[in-house]
Regions:
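PLP-dependent amino-acid enzyme catalytic core
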Residues: 1-130
Length: 130
């Protein structure tokens, strides 16, 4: 018997269209990673004459990529990630995961504006590895 392996890819536009299509047709909200898998599975089924079934398992929350998902559904650009979370929830009637929705009230633990030269970064990594 021969074994075959198929590989596909999806552009950002195709990924966004898949998010919108799945939501429109099934009222199911998917994240971009799942959308790539669904898009590629659809392409496989279009190309290959098979009676095989495909199961796409979604493990990521669409709210982790709320800006991409919301823009895919509405085409609207908003100010920040928290606004996208709120807007995605309002648009779809879904509830964001509590750990994500509570982020806005959490204390910032790390300074996001640190900058290191490559040699300083290498020194930090070596020191941490000791």
């Amino acid at each position: 018997s021969t074994k075959e392996f198929y590989g596909y890819c999806a552009s950002e536009e195709q990924t966004g269209s898949c998010i919108a299509e799945i939501y429109k047709n099934y009222k199911y909200l998917i994240d971009p990673h799942t959308a790539v898998g669904v898009y590629c599975a659809q392409k496989y089924l279009e190309e290959v004459n098979t009676s095989n079934k495909i199961l796409c398992v979604s493990t990521a929350s669409p709210y982790k990529c709320a800006s991409n998902v919301y823009k895919s559904l509405t085409g609207k650009v908003l100010a920040d990630e928290f606004e996208y979370i709120d807007a995605l929830s309002a648009f779809t009637g879904t509830i964001p995961p509590k750990p994500l929705s509570e982020l806005r009230s959490k204390e910032i633990r790390f300074n996001p504006s640190l900058s290191f030269s490559p040699s300083e970064m290498l020194s930090c990594v070596k020191k941490a590895a000791e």
